[in-house]
């Protein structure tokens, strides 16, 4: 027995599904179709009679305690069974096969344990109590009862009435807080149902389902647990609600299993070949008529569970094989794309190499042209500079020849004065002298002609002799002039100039030069 406190989000625990789900998510599975439209009065009485008159509910379990919230409104009755998605046109209920011969009395309906209301509406989530009966002690179609006061919104999957035609034998004991009855028959065919909360995550993840495992609920005829991810957003919950209207699973329409409604009621029992073969293999007798005994029902449930496990395992292997095939195709496509990309890379590398080679060739050609143009420009500038230097040398050479000619003539003329200069400053008194040179008209012409005529070594020797003679004559004249006394006076007075005549021979020509020396001695008193 599980009790959920009010005020928190109601979480329903389903022993068959082994999963947690929000109440708002499970509410989308039910609709507001009146239960009276699905069952007539006699069928409703049969359902309530079997529910209330079951000896295991009255003997084994004590009175169920329901903790109700006084502020919560009356809940609505919700019935849920596993064969609502079967191929049969009418909705199947686990209690429609029950006959009116079952024990049904007013005392069973007047107990304080059961409270029903004709108009049940729930607005706030409150306490939920769920009771499940073990299979070993119950008949094959004994339901598990869930009492809850949670707010429920219905879907077209399972017909649950919000307005129930209640028989006269039913008493309304607590009009304020009434429990919600959830019928969950523990039939083996519950495994055939599709839960939208299971379908949505598997389709979202696109992963192969795992085969059902041997869980504790399997031994009781329940569905093997399948864990599903809780919805992370309202979009996923809406998708789960839409998936509830899908077609039933291949297991529910499998020809290997007998339809659930054929196992109800009375009459001959027609089992499938797979069920008969499995029963014989397990060593159980094959039942041929209804209703089934407890041993036959237990054996049939076990066999049907094995067949369903086999079918689900085959389906799982098939989906896994499809998934692996898709993965192999993806690997093949990826490998082919990888090889194509490698080929493209190789082509691009070869193209890059050729382009680099062409670039190097172009660079070499450009550098060769540049060096040739630079060499040509260098040779042109060098030629121009050489021409300029040559012209300058020619001009400068002609100018220096003229200067040499005049300098040689001046040296020959002024040479005696160089020897007389130190003699004139030898005296202790201040002296001023003045050298006057008188040349005849033909002196320059003779000097020029003598410079041109000197070509051989003999002429140079003759000139050297004449020069030495002239120097000796000049020295004698200087000695004679120094021996002459000077006159001392305050005013400048000039004596008669002393004239010396000497003859110098240049070549075969005689040149007469008159050198007049004026000496004036100024004496300061």
UniProtKB/Swiss-Prot annotation:
Region (Basic motif): 301-330
Source species: Xenopus laevis (African clawed frog)
Alphabetized InterPro entries for the sequence: bZIP (IPR004827), bZIP_sf (IPR046347)
Lumenal topological domain residue ranges: 404-525
Lineage: Eukaryota, Metazoa, Chordata, Craniata, Vertebrata
Protein name: Cyclic AMP-responsive element-binding protein 3-like protein 2
Family assignment from sequence similarity: Belongs to the bZIP family. ATF subfamily.
Chief place where the protein resides: endoplasmic reticulum
Stretches with biased composition (Polar residues): 90-102, 213-239
Glycosylation sites: 490, 509, 522
Top-level taxon: Eukaryota
UniProt region (Disordered), positions on chain: 85-104, 203-267, 309-338
One cellular component (GO) term of this entry: endoplasmic reticulum membrane
Cytoplasmic side: 1-382
Membrane topology recorded in Swiss-Prot or TrEMBL: Single-pass type II membrane protein
């Amino acid at each position: 027995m599980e009790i959920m406190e009010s005020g928190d989000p109601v979480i329903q625990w389903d022993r068959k599904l082994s999963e947690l789900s929000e109440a708002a998510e499970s509410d989308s599975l039910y609709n507001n179709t009146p239960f009276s439209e699905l069952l007539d009065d006699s069928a409703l009485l049969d359902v309530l009679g079997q529910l209330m008159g079951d000896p295991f509910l009255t003997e084994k379990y004590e009175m169920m305690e329901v903790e109700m919230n006084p502020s919560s409104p009356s809940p609505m009755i919700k019935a849920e069974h596993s064969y609502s998605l079967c191929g049969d046109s009418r909705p199947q209920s686990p209690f429609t096969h029950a006959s009116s011969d079952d024990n049904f009395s007013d005392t069973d309906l007047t107990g304080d344990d059961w409270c029903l209301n004709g108009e049940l509406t729930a607005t706030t989530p409150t306490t939920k109590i769920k009771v499940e009966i073990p299979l070993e002690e119950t008949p094959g179609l004994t339901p598990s009862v869930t009492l809850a006061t949670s707010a429920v919104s219905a879907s077209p999957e399972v017909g649950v009435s919000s307005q129930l035609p209640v028989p006269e034998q039913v008493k309304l004991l607590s009009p304020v807080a009434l429990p919600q009855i959830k019928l969950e028959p523990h039939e083996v065919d519950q495994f055939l149902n599709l839960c939208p909360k299971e379908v949505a995550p598997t389709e979202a993840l696109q992963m192969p389902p795992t085969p059902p495992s041997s869980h504790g609920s399997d031994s009781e005829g329940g569905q093997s647990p399948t864990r599903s991810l809780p919805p992370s957003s309202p979009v996923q919950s809406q998708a789960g609600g839409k998936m509830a209207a899908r077609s039933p699973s291949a297991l529910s329409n499998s020809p290997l299993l007998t339809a659930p409604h054929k196992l109800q009621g009375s009459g001959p029992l027609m089992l499938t070949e797979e069920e008969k073969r499995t029963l014989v293999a397990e060593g159980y007798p094959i039942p041929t008529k209804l209703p089934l005994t407890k041993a036959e029902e237990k054996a049939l449930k076990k066999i049907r569970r094995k067949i369903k496990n086999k079918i689900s395992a085959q389906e799982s292997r098939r989906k896994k094989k499809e998934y692996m095939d898709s993965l192999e195709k993806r690997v093949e496509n990826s490998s082919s794309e990888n090889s194509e990309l490698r080929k493209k890379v190789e082509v691009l590398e070869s193209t890059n190499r050729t382009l680099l080679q062409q670039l190097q060739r172009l660079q070499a050609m450009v550098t060769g042209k540049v060096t040739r143009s630079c060499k040509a420009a260098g040779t042109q500038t060098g030629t121009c500079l050489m021409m300029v230097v040559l012209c300058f040398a020619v001009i400068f050479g002609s100018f220096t020849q003229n200067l040499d000619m005049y300098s040689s003539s001046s040296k020959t003329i002024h040479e005696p004065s160089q020897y007389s200069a130190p003699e004139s400053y030898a005296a202790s008194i201040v002296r001023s002298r003045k050298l006057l040179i008188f040349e005849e008209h033909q002196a320059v012409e003779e000097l020029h002609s003598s410079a041109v005529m000197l070509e051989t070594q003999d002429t140079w020797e003759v000139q050297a002799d004449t020069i030495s003679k002239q120097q000796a004559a000049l020295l004698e004249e200087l000695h004679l002039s120094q021996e002459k006394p000077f006159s001392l006076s305050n005013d400048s007075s000039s004596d008669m100039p002393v004239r010396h005549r000497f003859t110098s021979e240049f070549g075969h020509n005689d040149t007469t030069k008159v050198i007049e020396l004026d000496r004036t001695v100024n004496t300061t008193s």
